[in-house]
């Protein structure tokens, strides 16, 4: 299986992490990155095109442990990806001091949202990252909307941040 790498300029990385992880994180923050897909010999490379931070009125609900976007927000980010001809990368933050991993509610949300985005963007890959103050985890749906694989790293300049890879690739654990 090829590595999955997300390339982000250093200034963009700093801005994204600052937005997602404010000094006093009262609830999960979220945003979407628009990326171009550049398959290479040994890696699936996704390169930054644009960033959209979700404003407070873009959430239907959010807390320290869960968020839900408004229908208008979901439609807006999907339409923008369609107009740009890009894939979407969902980013959101988790509070706390434990290593980054998607929660059960995150994984269940992917079961509904990823197939919808996959259909709307005509089979373009979908990526999702969860970030904490110390690390990140990520999943990528490259070949179909039901089979994720881990994101290996984020390339920032000459450095690579590696994923915790703590999130399960199968949802059956959470379907009981």
Predicted regions and their residues:
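Conserved beta-strand-loop surface patch within small alpha/beta domains used
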Residues: 1-89, 96-176
